[in-house]
């Protein structure tokens, strides 16, 4: 079935690693243009993303992958630093739990989703949106993350949800190039998947060939309807930011508000490099000291400075070491980094220096930046929680269509994010125990809070007493 084909997330990066500068950007941009053109020719549908938004998506990936740009030094890779730090913090204490009676296929599907979590989150932080495709495997589901520049939105509703999406896979067999194009369309009767296979003719789409032409596509059908599957059959992870590019409902990169500052940082780094290059010590010599070499080029002799007197000026040689002005450039760099932290809701010191003697900060300022950072992380964790719910619902719906057992409709894992940036779990647990000791709180409720257990009914409270309270619980 078409819904069981993995690998489409890598189709536009064939033969190139994700960190390749220069040629990677050219190849990826060309791949984006090919994808849009091919889908329009095959299905008569074009990308609904605005031109301004498409340019912004390319810019975000340029910033992340450090694509060279005139007048900028991309070596610091601040965008990659932002994404890496946020992703690590979001999943630092991430844990999912299923009820003890949950079937094995459900557990394996959730484990596969967790394995793709960090990749999907980083794709979403860079491109604003990432799709997770459920792929049937051994009676359960695996998940393939598809980043923003590897699919084309063909239709969206008023809230920005995908109503149709196109993807492409490239295949090479016996020296011939093929493009497998897929369009997913949401409908009232379920999900419709249309698949076309084309033999590429140079840079053009070429002719449509039967799907059985390639062994990898032999089991596909030109059109497939999956009843009961909502949306486009893909879980969606979006960044929780308002669109600051064109005002549309498209999701934006986590560092989209600071894109201008990131370019300014790259220019500042280039200027700082030039400052150090210009600050190298130089020797100025009189022209009459130059001698032609074997190629006729005039240069100083190797033994010129043998026996140089105490005063070099007497022999026409001057040593010059210009003073460096790196202080002003470094101060400007720190100012730009602090601006990025403020725009993106990062704690002070994540990107910039924690504190400089010239700019002491008050406890209120420190607390304010910590609160902003905590809210940023919570927003991202909430976005992933919603994606997990979507993915588990898709597994249940697709499992019913494919005839897979062990994927109940009510599969909803409990997610524990740990203490968070500001949350002090130990302090609250100590307060709970004080309330229990004072007789103001039932110990079952305190244990239910600590272990995140259901506690709405007497039966659930009785189960807590049985598991944790021993003889004291049975006495009650």
Model-derived segments and spans:
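Long amphipathic alpha-helical coiled-coil segments
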Residues: 393-401, 439-458
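Short coil/turn segments at secondary-structure boundaries
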Residues: 277-283, 350-356, 410-411, 444-451, ...
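Extended, regular secondary-structure scaffolds
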Residues: 133-247
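Long, highly charged low-complexity segments enriched in Glu/Asp and Lys/Arg with interspersed Ser/Thr
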Residues: 454-475
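C-terminal structured domain segments
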Residues: 423-445
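Surface-exposed loop-to-helix/strand elements on domain peripheries
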Residues: 106, 308-427, 465-472
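Extended, helix-rich architectural segments
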Residues: 2-162, 475-476
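Extended, charged amphipathic alpha-helical segments
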Residues: 215-368
